[in-house]
Each structure stands twice: as structure tokens, then as C-alpha cells.
UniProtKB/Swiss-Prot annotation:
InterPro entries assigned: Topo_IA, Topo_IA_2, Topo_IA_AS, Topo_IA_cen, Topo_IA_cen_sub1, Topo_IA_cen_sub2, Topo_IA_cen_sub3, Topo_IA_core_domain
CDD domains: TOP1Ac, TOPRIM_TopoIA_TopoIII
Lineage: Archaea, Methanobacteriati, Methanobacteriota, Methanomada group, Methanococci
Keyword Zinc-finger on entry: yes
Cofactor: Mg(2+)
Gene transcribed to yield this protein: topA
Catalytic activity: ATP-independent breakage of single-stranded DNA, followed by passage and rejoining
Name of protein: DNA topoisomerase 1
Site positions for Interaction with DNA: 55, 167, 171, 317, 502
GO biological process, alphabetically ordered: DNA recombination; DNA repair; DNA topological change
Species this chain originates from: Methanocaldococcus jannaschii (strain ATCC 43067 / DSM 2661 / JAL-1 / JCM 10045 / NBRC 100440) (Methanococcus jannaschii)
Amino acid sequence: MAEIMTALIICEKPSVAKKIANALGKAKKKSIDGVPYYELERDGKKIIVASAVGHLFTLVEKENKEFGFYPVFDIKWVPASVDKGKEYVNKYIKALKKLSKDADEFYIATDWDIEGELIGYHALKYCCGREKAKRMRFSSLTKKEIVRAFENPDEIDYGLVDAGESRHILDWYFGINLSRALMNAIRAVNRWKTMSVGRVQGPALAFLTERELEIKKFIPKPYWVIEALLKDNLKAIHEKEKFWNEKEAKNVYEKIKDEKSAKVVEIKKTKRKLKPLPPFDLGTLQREAYSYFKISPKETQEIAQKLYENALISYPRTSSQKLPKDRKYLEDILNIIKNHPVYGKWAERILKENLKPVEGKKEDPAHPAIHIVDIPKEELSEKEKEIYDLIARRTLAAFWDNAEREYLNVKIDIKGEKFKLSGSRTVKEGWHEIYYFPKFDEIELPPLKKNDIIKVEKITITRKETQPPKRYTVASIIKELEKRGLGTKATRAEIIDKLIKRGYVIDDGSLKVTDLGISVIETLKRFCPEIIDEKMTRDLEEKLEKIQFRKIKKDDVLDEAEKRLRKILEEFKKKEEDIGIYLIKNLDATNKKAKIVGKCPKCGGDLILIRHKKGRFVGCSNYPECDVKYSLPDKGRIKIPNKVCDACKSPILKIGDREICINPECPLKQVEVKEEDRICPKCGAKLILKKGVYGAFYGCSNYPKCKYTEPINKKEVVGKCPKCGGDLVVREGKFGKFVGCSNYPKCRYTEKLKLNEKEEK
């Protein structure tokens, strides 16, 4: 009897391996050292479905040279377990090696993109000792797609593999060498600070800094606006909109301020048809998710990937705005969606009337636009529901009718001065019925005709100022990076995330470049502008694309990049000490500024946040001449919100989640306390009244030997904590009173307040 052939399918993640195994047959789950894999039989063939866990291999130096040595270009691929926190990768490598020994043929079933091709190829090459395999390509994890991909396999795309390897190598070349160069510049002046800059992060931070400096240097320019408040709460604005000359504005105002009527001199009515919005590419999905739900681009990408792995949507990392051309494929999906309680009626009409979807301009050689493929069978999290709903509605709306809007522009005359008012309304909802997220202004004007007289209630003149350019948001920056050709659809969200993590940028609703970020860019711009030149980065991105399509060779691009970088680093080394001095000067100024809390009430000096081995406090910069000092708690992360207390005008600090006034004598902290002898229950010494940033409290007179404290209004004990034996006391939270352990935060036991306890309180 002939031996049964064994096929090994390598997936990107364990969850995808399970999906693929169950789609191909009745799979049996097994494991090697805790690593799951699946076995099944299909068409007389034994199939093993196993997985990687993302990238199993990473780049390191071939030889460990002295600490901080650069430039380094001699690198190799090794198991990713060398990275901290990635030790678990070894188990997956060993499992694939073991499973590959009995395999006769191999399939790669990782994500169909550059990273997926590289993950699969590396697993095949370094774990299985093979260079060739069949390639399963799919854009969704539905059973039908998986079976089709298995029965009609492709070959490995070595252009994608080369492009993937080249991207990782270039990122290593630039990231490691430039970061070491910066740190060595600081070491050259006998200082130390961890610094980093990357191939794409540098140019991205550079144009963010450019915008930040525009905002800092912006000088507001005054202008005047004249408006007429009309009957029925209508508001008309002078046709000039902005008066840049105050005298001219006031002359117009004086001329018409007492007028009580306006004459309609012109009416223009226009209708516009608004086509449905095209289906989502990743960048547009990220922007819309942030705009409507404030979900960050990085989180949107992660949620979309999870929805894809659960076979609810198609592959999310796509540039396409076009749905698949295969009508049968779309009809199969619509036949599933028509059973949905909300989307069903729309899917039914699309099927019944054979409606065709609109397309956007963007294309992707591998994947169609993001679209739904199934209905959730399990409960989704709130954010998953929002992203799924956004994609579902956008998919269905692409098939729908145009929306129709009517716009009314009216010109009125007030004593020879022309004013304008406008209205708009929706005539036909069309696709907006389904994808209702974009806001349509509905401004109804009363029926008006030429020569009508309208009552004027009031004329106003308002001085305004021009506003600085807006900062980018985490969503708008994705569009800007795409426009400038920096990064890829899969990496742009991560680029911004790294800039935030490194302290170069903060996200408080918009992206603000920190003083640290500005000082790094100013240093590089002055001494080594090539590092932050986006033309060089864009050129490399274009070459990576050419590698992908086999138009140029990988080695040629890497050799050219190495020569280019060596030249940059040679110049950098010549100026190393100057760069270090300039960078430290900027960093010291930044650090000093970051520690300033406010002004000293005694001498007018700066109040500075000081961290000392004996504790934390705020002290005057003019010490020892000025001895103003405010103690701070030992625990809790401190932030400086640049606010002052309404009651005493002292600076406010945010410690943990609480904003507090640093002044212990603040009127808001004063309490009336009866004089009474109190004894410390811990050591027997006398308890004395003390004042701190949180207000007055009792503390042991034997401090610092005894650190016992208790609040002035000590909470009444209502029982013993079943978890730690501490006292249970009545506390008050944002949802009302409850019983909690007095040993919080060490013990977080809580319970509901009983009725009799409420009555006693």
C-alpha cells in the first residue's frame, strides 16, 4: 500500500491556523511543547496546519563590537527569541522544524502582503530547510476562499520576499546606526541619554516640527466681521466676510447699525447629486474611525486585523478602493448579510435590483477594498462593533443611490451694503441613509423671493483674530504621510506610535511636538540634514516597490543605501562633539523648562519640581537665598498641567489621577479641628495636626521613625475585610457610596453599601 503524502501548511498566527484547518476538513487539534497544530485528511492526503507567531526571525550584528560602535552593516537573520519578551518564539520554531521532517510538500498560508510573504518564507527556509513551496493566497478567511486558495495554489512571490527583507535591512541600517550616532555625540561631551531616530520617523518628525514651529511663531492678525441678525433667527454676513481695515469696518457698521429692514436682491438655488463614498482602503478607514469614534489608527488596524482573522471582513491592509469584480462572490456575501436584522433590507434590495458598487481611484495588486464577508456569531466588544458597523455600512452604501442636496444662496441689501445668507437641505437621502456618519447641515430658510423685505433685529461688529495652522491629529497625519510617500499602509500608524512613545510627540487630541522632539530635529537640521530628508526616504520607498516587481535587484539597492549612509555617518563623526554640545544645550534647556511648575510667591523666581533620594518637592530656583518649599507625596506620577489654583493662585500639579494645589495653606484645604489629645495606635507617641498637598491630617510626632497617619474625619469602620483582614470603611466614589478596604490600594476589596449602613450614614 502506497504511503499517504503529508502536506504542511504554515500560517501566520495560531488563530488563523485553526480557521484554515477547520475550513479544509475535520481537524484534530494536537500540540508540541504547548504549541498547537492541526491534523486532517483531505483527498487522500494528510494535512498538518501549523503556524508562526508573526516574525520568527530578526536581524542582529554578526559580531558584537564595542558598545555603541557604528557604522554597522554586517548583519544576519537569527531567531526573534533574542529580543526581550520574545523567548516564546523558540517553541514555534522547534515545532515547525519537527513537523517539517515528515512533510512531502509545503504550503505558505500567511497574510498576502510583504510582511506575510517574508514571515512564510523565513519559516520555510530557516525552520523547514526549504526554498520553495506552494502559496495559498486569499483576501478573506471564509471557508470558500480558503478552499479555493488551497485547491488553486500559487508560487512564492520572491519579489515580495526581497522587498520585505530589504525593508527590514534598511530600517536596521538607518535605525541602529543613526541612533548610535546620536548617543555617541552625547557621550562625546561626557553625558548619557538614550536617543533614537529612524529612516521614516526622522522625516515624519521633521515635518511635524515644521508645523509646530509655524504655530509657535504665528502672530495673530486682527480682522472684523459684520453680521445682520434677521427675523426668525436668521444670520447674514457681510459679503466681504473679513474686514482687514478697522476704520473701513467701523464706517460700514456706523452706516447701517440702525437699519431695521433688508431687501432680497438675489436668490440662487442649486441642486447637487452626491455619489456614494467608495469602499474603504486602510488609510481612509483609520481616518473615519478616529473622526467618528476617536479610535486611534493603530488600534483601528489591530481591530480590523482581528475582525479579518474571525472571518468577518476582508483583509484590511489594502490600498484598494474597489470591491472584487466577481459578482458571484459579492452575491454570496449579500445572501449572508440579508439575514442581518439591520443590514438585511439593504442587502436584499442590492440583490433584487442587481445594483453595482461605486469604485474609488486607488488600487492594490493583491487585495480588494475592505468589505464585510459575514455576520458576527459571537458578541463583539464595543470598539469592534463600531469598526464592523463602519465597514458594513460603507460596503453596502457603495451599491446605493446618489444622495441629493439643495443649496440656497440669498443676497440681501442693507442701505447699499450687500450681505449673504445660505441654507441647505437634503432632498434625497440615498446612500446617506446607510452610511450616515458624514454630517449634512440642514439649514432651512423661510420661503423668499426677490424684492422681499426682511426685518433686521440687530447689526453687530466683532473683532476676531486669524488662527495659527492646525496641528495634525493621529488620523490626519496618516493622510499626510501617504501624500508625502512616507511609510506604507501597514507601518504609518506604528511610526506615529513610536514618536509618541519616545517622547518626541504628545497626543492630547492633536499631535504636539515636545521640546525634546524639536531639539532633536533642530540639531539634525543644523549638522546633518540628510538624515531627515524625506526625498531620500521617498526614493528608498520607490526602490522597494521596484524590488517587489523585480525591476531592480535587492543587493543593488542595499549597496547604494549603505554607501549613502556611510557618507552621512562619516560627516556626522567629524562633527560629533559639536553635535553633542548643541544637543545637550537644547536638552538641558528642555529639561529645565519641563521642571518649571510656576512662579515663586516670595521672590518671583521659578518654582522647580525636584526629585531627590529623600523624596520629591517643589522648591525655588533662587535657593538658598529663597527657602520656599512645598513637599509632595512619594508616590504617583507627576505631570505639570500649567494651571493655577482659583482660590490661592498657587501652581497645580497632577499627581496620579488627581489635580492638587501645591500650597498646604490654600483656603480650600482649611478645616476646623477641635484641640484634643490623640495617641498614635502604632507607637504610642502623640498625634499632631499636619498640613500637606492633600490638605490637613493627623501624623505621628515620632516621624520619620513612625509614619502613621490618619484623616481628620476618620471613616467609621463597618466590618473586617474578608480578603486581607483590614478594616472595611464607607467610601464615596463617582457612582455613590460603597464599602471598601482601608488598606487600599494594596487591597482593592469592595462591596455594595447595605441599606441599614446607608441609613446610619
